[in-house]
Design a protein with these regions (language model features):
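CoA-thioester-processing core
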Residues: 1-31, 45, 61, 65
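Helix-loop "lid/cap" segments that line or gate small-molecule binding pockets
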Residues: 30-31, 42, 83-88, 101-106
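A general structural signal for well-ordered alpha-helical segments in protein cores
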Residues: 15, 24-27, 59, 66, ...
C-alpha cells in the first residue's frame, strides 16, 4: 500500500475494503508503512485466487474460468454478482437481497431448464429468461 509514501491514503474505499479483507491490524501496518503486500502473502490471505508463473498462464486460466461461467445460467450469475456486492454495501440487507433473488430465480425459465437438465442428466441450455 504505497499511497502513504505519496502523502495519501488508499482511495476509492481502499482503507475500508482492505481492513475487511485482511483485518484491522494487518491493514493498519501495510497502509501506515507503505509496504507492498507480496504475492504469496496475498494468496495466503485470500486476496488473490491463484498465482501464475507467466501472463500467458494467467490468461489461459482466465479463459478456462470464463468458458465455465458462460455455461451457467446468466440470470443466476447476475444475481450472484448482485448478492455478493450487496454483502459489502452497508445500505443493503444482503440476506433480504439474497432471498428476493432466490425467489425471482425460482420463477425463471432457466431454473426450469436447469432442474430438468439435472434430472435428465444432460447439459442445461440456458436462455437467460
Amino acid at each position: 500500500q504505497p499511497e502513504v509514501n505519496l502523502g495519501l491514503i488508499p482511495g476509492y474505499g481502499g482503507t475500508q475494503r482492505l481492513s475487511h479483507l485482511i483485518g484491522k491490524g494487518r491493514a493498519m501496518e501495510y497502509m501506515m508503512t507503505g509496504d507492498m503486500i507480496q504475492a504469496e502473502q496475498a494468496m495466503g490471505w485470500g486476496l488473490v485466487n491463484q498465482l501464475y508463473e507467466s501472463k500467458e498462464e494467467m490468461l489461459a486460466d482466465a479463459q478456462r474460468i470464463l468458458q465455465k461461467i458462460f455455461t451457467k445460467a446468466p440470470l443466476a450469475i447476475g444475481q450472484v454478482i448482485a448478492c455478493v456486492n450487496g454483502a459489502f454495501d452497508p445500505k443493503t440487507d444482503g440476506y433480504q437481497l439474497e432471498a428476493n433473488s432466490f425467489s425471482h430465480l425460482c420463477k425463471s425459465a432457466d431454473f426450469r431448464e436447469g432442474t430438468s437438465a439435472f434430472l435428465e442428466k444432460r447439459q442445461a441450455q440456458f436462455s437467460g429468461k
